[in-house]
């Protein structure tokens, strides 16, 4: 029993309400179910979208030609000389908080102190798919552990959002689909954006949430999602930091950090799956840990809007990196959104831990 919890298990004060809420939600959604084959739209809407519950759907897109065709060589040949956008980082972490210790930071004013921490986004480079594949498949030794990240080999990741499949990869659209029919029929609309993702085990997406219903289809490799429901944003250690981006010296191969001008503060999560597991051991009265979901080739994950997620990936048994297509459907800004906003604002005032703003 926590200090603020009554003998009957009910919350006794405002702060303890948040622990109680997490416990209630995790009892309702303790795991992510798996269903075989594309569900009927009414079933998908009733059991998962309306219930705000993630689900893995297996064998939902076996008819895609991509399931047979997509290899790195095929993608490179299909795209030819077309330039694509590739996000490049020194450590695989794009859109993340970064300590500036040991980094060369540019963009500070004459009288401005270098910030201790920044919110950094990847460097975006234009290259052909073949050049991306060559960079991705260049062997990387194990002797970089003691080297500062600014001097490590670049980690490329095809991860541009807001409709990258249709905008940058039109030659690949015929290999998959412009929508997931069961999801479009259930939600009564086409997806707002369809994105292509290609990366290996070095790339990591830090905890965040989206205001989209997300249907994430894995064609090759494995995607590993760590999920938290909307009520658990309080645990993610949000901090504000100035916005910045990675820059690199192509000749010397070193990375630096460039601050945005004018200055812009971004609130972002600092927690990791490992830090949340550690916290659960040291705070046993509030032992929240993420739900871990592996999504393999031929499977898709429905990730409800506003659920927090951290994503990594792995190669398959043939050594092919993770290749995926995801569909973003605009969420309905209904009472669920209002409840999530209320919880967020209440915790910011009474909870004692950081929360997204």
List the model feature ranges, each with a label.
Residues 2-300, 308-357:
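N-terminal accessory scaffold of Fe(II)-dependent oxygenases
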């Amino acid at each position: 029993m926590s200090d603020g919890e009554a003998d009957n298990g009910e919350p006794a004060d405002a702060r303890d309400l948040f622990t109680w809420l997490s416990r209630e939600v995790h009892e309702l959604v303790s795991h992510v179910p798996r269903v075989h084959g594309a569900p009927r739209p009414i079933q998908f809407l009733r059991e998962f979208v309306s219930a705000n519950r993630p689900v893995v759907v297996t064998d939902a897109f076996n008819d895609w030609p991509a399931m047979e065709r997509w290899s790195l060589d095929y993608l490179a040949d299909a795209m030819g000389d077309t330039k694509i956008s590739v996000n490049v980082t020194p450590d695989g972490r794009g859109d993340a908080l970064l300590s500036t210790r040991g980094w060369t930071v540019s963009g500070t004013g004459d009288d401005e102190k270098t910030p201790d921490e920044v919110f950094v986004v990847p460097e975006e480079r234009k290259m052909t798919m073949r050049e991306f594949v060559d960079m991705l498949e260049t062997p990387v030794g194990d002797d970089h552990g003691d080297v500062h990240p600014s001097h490590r080999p670049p980690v490329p990741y095809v991860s541009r959002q807001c409709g990258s499949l249709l905008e940058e990869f039109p030659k690949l659209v015929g290999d998959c689909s412009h929508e997931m029919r069961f999801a479009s029929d259930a939600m009564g609309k086409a997806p707002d954006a369809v994105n292509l993702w290609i990366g290996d085990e070095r790339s990591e997406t830090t905890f965040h949430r989206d205001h989209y219903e997300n249907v994430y289809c894995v064609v090759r490799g494995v995607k590993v999602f760590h999920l938290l429901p909307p009520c658990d944003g309080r645990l993610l250690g949000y901090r504000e930091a100035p916005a910045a981006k990675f820059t690199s010296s192509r000749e010397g191969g070193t990375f630096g950090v460039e601050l945005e001008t004018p200055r812009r503060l971004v609130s972002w999560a600092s927690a990791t799956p490992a830090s949340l597991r550690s916290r659960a051991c040291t705070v046993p009265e509030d032992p929240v840990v993420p739900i871990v979901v592996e999504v393999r080739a031929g499977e898709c994950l429905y990730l409800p809007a506003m659920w927090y997620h951290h994503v990594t990936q792995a190669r398959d048994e043939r050594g092919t990196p993770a290749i995926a297509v995801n569909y973003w459907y605009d969420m309905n800004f209904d009472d669920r959104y209002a409840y999530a906003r209320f919880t967020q604002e209440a915790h910011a005032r009474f909870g004692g831990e950081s929360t997204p703003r």
